[in-house]
Amino acid sequence: MLLLKASAICGKGNEGKRNKKGGFTLIELTVVLAIMAIILMVIAPNFSYVKDSAKAKVDKQNCAAIERSVEMLLAEDAISSSVTNIKITSSNGNVQISGISDDTGKSKLQDLLEDLDKPQSGDSYNVDIENGRKVTVSIV
């Protein structure tokens, strides 16, 4: 009897029991992966919204910069008040301007807009001038 108790205390007699090692089971890993997949499915559409929103904001800022530049050149009479429409195209860092016949006004506007990027949502910027004062910029 005394031998049995000693073997139980020393851990002998447990040969039939499974020796457990630390780690995760396949079910636990599967559950974690499923939860991560669900989280990604919820978050992914928000990333595309943020990207589209950023593009729209860049276009809006570029339009505002063009508007201020044209208004300034109109105030300086570098652009004639008879000009009613200007088309601005930017590609590979080159800004092309059509609708201004005066080379001085055209070159001043090109200098002001030298860092202008191509619009994110179109091909070019369209500048409408009403009564030689009111400037409206849109993307075409």
Swiss-Prot record:
The keyword Nuclease does not apply. The modification N-methylphenylalanine is found at F24. It is a single-pass membrane protein. The keyword Transmembrane helix applies. GO terms for cellular component: membrane. Its main location: membrane. The chain crosses the membrane at residues 24-44. Disulfide bonds: none annotated. It is found in: Membrane. Residues 1-23 form a propeptide. It holds the Pfam family N_methyl. It comes from the Bacteria. Keywords: Membrane, Methylation, Transmembrane, Transmembrane helix. InterPro entries: N_methyl_site, Pilin-like. Not yet known. NCBIfam families: IV_pilin_GFxxxE. This is Prepilin peptidase-dependent protein A. It comes from Clostridium perfringens (strain 13 / Type A).
